[in-house]
A protein has these predicted regions:
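Structural motif
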Residues: 37-41, 67-68
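Glycine-rich nucleotide/cofactor/substrate-binding loop typically near the N-terminus or early
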Residues: 107
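Alpha/beta enzyme core
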Residues: 47-71, 76-78, 112-208
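N-terminal amphipathic alpha-helix/helix-capping segment at the start of soluble metabolic enzymes
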Residues: 1-39, 49, 83-104, 112
Length: 208
């Protein structure tokens, strides 16, 4: 099957694409793919329209759902569907590639977020079980990363990548890396990701 650039894909194209096809479509877009992260737990900006749909209307190519619990998914303003259909409903409404974040966090460090928006839940942990459930729900991309204060180290990302790659690496695109230190001393600034970390991520199974 001929693969288009992601920039040229229709929703029906994306629905038919495999993981390999999606990676080729992204690569073919030469760095011009736009991803946007949204949080379904927070109130929608447009009240009765999901933030994912709003982001799609602003030309996002990949929707990344942060704080998405695969065991108890919540997307405010999404029409009522069975929990296992949550991701497929977002894809139906937006026609976009949909990914989620999973976090290989340090349980002790994550306790600092108890009582806050960032409080960890079992359905957000970077485990093979959660990744398999996400794949079954229709997720196209899993990003192994960390929210503020959850104690996600690059070493933990590598270890979870190995397990998740073995479980769903043939079905789902896997990405790895952090935008901030996630509460890990020594992994801020230039140390957020080093060339050695990038190599370790690739060896462990990261596609992106």
């Amino acid at each position: 099957m001929s693969v288009k650039r992601l920039l040229d894909c229709t929703p029906s194209d994306l629905a038919a694409y495999s993981k390999t096809d999606l990676l080729a479509a992204i690569a073919g877009s030469e760095g011009r793919v736009l991803a946007c992260e949204t949080i379904g737990l927070t109130p929608p900006l447009l009240v009765d329209v999901t933030n994912a749909e709003y982001a799609a209307s602003l030309s996002t190519d990949i929707l990344l759902l942060n704080m998405f619990d695969v065991q108890h998914p919540v997307i405010n303003a999404l029409p009522k569907v069975p929990e296992e259909e949550t991701v497929r409903e977002i894809k139906r409404l937006t026609g976009r590639v949909v990914g989620i974040n999973l976090e290989p966090c340090d349980p002790q460090a994550a306790k600092s977020n108890d009582g806050t928006l960032w409080k960890m839940s079992s359905g957000r942990l970077a485990t093979a079980e959660n990744a398999s459930r996400a794949a079954d729900m229709g997720v196209d991309l899993i990003v192994l990363t960390g929210n503020p204060g959850n104690g996600v180290s690059n070493e933990l990302i590598v270890e979870s990548l190995k397990d998740i790659s073995a479980a769903v690496g043939d079905r789902v695109m896997l990405a790895a890396g952090k935008m901030h230190a996630s509460g890990v001393a020594g992994e801020g600034g230039e140390q957020i990701m080093t060339p050695a970390d990038a190599e370790a991520f690739m060896v462990a199974g990261a596609d992106i």
